[in-house]
Amino acid sequence: MAKTFSILGDSISTFDGWNPPGFDVFYSDERLEKTGVTHVEQTWWHLLIDHFGGTLLKNDSFSGSLVEGGFFPAGDSDARADAILGNEGEAPDAIVCFIGINDYGWGGAKMNADGHGSACPAELSAQAPVEKVLAELAAPGQIERFKTAYASMLARLRARCPETEIWRVTLVPGRIAGHAKPQFAYDFRGVPFAEYNDAIRAAAHEAGAHVADAFACGMDYEAIEGTHPTARGMRQLAGMFAWSMEHETEIDAALGRGARELATVPQSMLPAELLSEWEDATLWRSAPLCADKPCSFCEHAMAPNNAWLLMCGNA
């Protein structure tokens, strides 16, 4: 496995003092105590790099960022692609990309701009209405825009790092700490969660990049509000990422390389060491709660006045 790693991500992958100057960071100040992630060694990316015996070159993660957007701080922007390189312009041996949950939560770059998202590119904010608008459904064609942006992001990285091993990690559902049942909203704005992961896989396969299909593990990770991992959730993510990177071929053999929707591997394929991060792995298997309507229309939405919160209050 690679010696030097760079990370491209959103808030889940930030940590105070470890991201480029001026980048928004989630894991800082009082949030460190709230999540229990008080030391950088507890982050998923530090744990993953340690697992492979590597070192961090650059953590190019910006809190709140989407893939789509075309301008900084979107993942699909020249500035983010430039930030993946070392201070001397050197390319890493491997890039691990874990980004896209904000695209799912907002329903796209335009909705992020209209909702006055904190990480919206200035070029898009300038076109947004003065008053905040929180639309319930993603605009038609959202998954195609996401896949196009994801492929463009990959092309920007490849142009700067032609010899680098690039890993695309699929999105993983979270669960609030202490909750005994699945809570994740699998159809938040009318575009199913599975379609985002299928788009990630397709874009990666078409570009010849690796896919770490962490979703295929079939597990929820622990988070303070369902999105941002606790210290335990960080260990769970790191374990799922490492296992899916090491077993890419076996996952493809079990599930195929086409659209997987919500397919996961049998829990018997997962090693005991990985499952030990859940006190009862059977209870932490992820599953959709219902298929009645998009979650943003539902009376059980946990934060209807929030821009987004991907949890169901009826679970």
Please report, for each region that a protein language model flagged, where it lies by residue:
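Viral virion structural and adsorption modules
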Residues: 3, 84-86, 198, 206, ...
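Conserved SGNH/GDSL esterase-like catalytic core that processes O-acyl groups on lipids
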Residues: 4, 15-129, 135, 140-144, ...
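Short hydrophobic segments within beta-strands
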Residues: 8-9, 169
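Short, well-ordered beta-to-alpha junction loops that form the rim of enzyme active sites
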Residues: 62, 100, 170-173, 215-216
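Generic structural signal for well-ordered alpha-helices
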Residues: 81, 150-154, 197
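Substrate-gating cap/lid alpha-helix
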Residues: 156, 173-214, 240
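A short helix->loop->beta-strand "cap" motif at the edges of active sites that frequently abuts
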Residues: 161-165
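Histidine-centered active-site loop/cap adjacent to the catalytic His
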Residues: 192-193, 224-274
